Amino acid sequence: MSTLGQGDFELAVRQQPKYACVAIERKPIDPPPIVQLMVNPRKDPGRTFLQNPYLILTARLIRKGDEDQDEQTGPKESDLTGTLVSSLYSLKDTDNSQGGFFVFGDLSVRRVGTYRLAFILYELRLAEKECWLLSRTVSDPFVVYATKTFPGLAESTFLTRSFSDQGVRLRLRKDSRTVSTKKRTISQADQIRASQGIHGYLPHDANHDLSPNGHSPHHLRRLSSLHDQAQLDRSRSYYSESPQMRPGEYTSSSYGYAPYDDQKPHKRARMDGASPDSPHPSSAGGGGGGYETDTTAYHSYAHHAHHSGPRTVPDALGSIYPLTTSGYAVAPQPALTGLPMPSPYASMPRLDTTHLPPHSPAGAPGSASSAFSPGTIGSSSRRSPPGTAGGYPSYAGHAHAGQAMFTSQPTSLPYHPAVAHGHPGAGGLGIAVGLDLDERH
């Protein structure tokens, strides 16, 4: 390199800077300046300068029209920040030819205005301990914007991407980025909405007043309607998952129980006395149990009962149809003299001191084990809500039996030790059926 003089080097700015943002947020000059070093082929036919590690290029900020300006009148040295010096890179050009390039990927300007970049090439000569100026060049003018007016960084150029793929540290951007400022003009906002296909609800006029929270009344009404629609959708999805009810069908929710109480181990007794395998209540016999014909009132009450939470069954209802361990109702059976009653009847509540007469024949009015009379509630053609008189359906399957199996007077069964009736193996209390009250003492 000792044979190469000052006139043998030539600098060419391959990528000119276009604009920059004031360096409050350290925005780099876009695109990054790239300078190519070219040497006279006759002086260096072997292109040995590409491997010279002592060639450096510096960047300095100057005014728009000044190429040789005075340091006192020009920009300060502190106005240009970042990496101001670049070493030589041996890279492949876009035409796949080898060349020497200086890349400035981290340059920022701290003052708003229009400037140029002055590039000066130096060679360090360690033997002589000197630094020789070999060449210089100046870039095209570029504008430094304030933060509010900065148009944003553009997409990376093909030359920048090519050098980045070869190992040079450069910031790549796939698409153009616009600055999102709070004081954007109305025209810019409308252009963005039009490009994205969005039609805002906020009218853009000079007389449009905003509420204190930043929303217009029209926008607030729109938000309110969207909120109501969301609640309606949630309600529809909730009821679509609930069991559907048809007029004439009675489920657990129509009697005030929760809709999923039927899935628990202790199931509630069906009011119609149907078998567990039957999904619907039996409709045999005349009268039909007094189903309600007004579907509007029925569904309004079912909706109220569905949201009112689970309720307990009255004690009188438990005495009508006792429950077994499986959770289903047991049809009333006549009492048999001398035999212990089933276990569900042992837990029957005592309504009064009235007892069964001794040796009552099966089917007699006095031998019935239930105090419920279907004739008292089946006379009305409309159903009353639970909790009122006659508010429970009658069992239509036993309508043909008439009054033979029911009594109008409440009865109770006295408790006796099982040993007193010839059951020494029993370990609990037995029930004596058909015994007089005096026999218990």
Curated annotation (Swiss-Prot):
Pfam families on file: Velvet
Keyword set includes Transport: no
Q: What happens when the gene is disrupted?
A: Results in decreased production of chaetoglobosin A.
GO CC aspect terms: cytoplasm; nucleus
- GO biological process, any: sporulation resulting in formation of a cellular spore
The entry's localization annotation reads: Nucleus; Cytoplasm
Gene3D superfamilies documented for this protein = Velvet domain (2.60.40.3960)
Give positions of region: Disordered: 200-220, 234-295, 341-396
Please describe the quaternary structure of this protein. Answer: Component of the heterotrimeric velvet complex composed of laeA, veA and velB; VeA acting as a bridging protein between laeA and velB.
What organism is recorded for this protein? Chaetomium globosum (strain ATCC 6205 / CBS 148.51 / DSM 1962 / NBRC 6347 / NRRL 1970) (Soil fungus)
This protein's name: Velvet complex subunit B
The alphabetized UniProt keywords are: Cytoplasm, Nucleus, Sporulation, Transcription, Transcription regulation
Velvet domain: residues covered: 1-173
PROSITE patterns the UniProt entry points to: VELVET
**Expression triggers:** Expression is negatively regulated by laeA.
State the superkingdom: Eukaryota
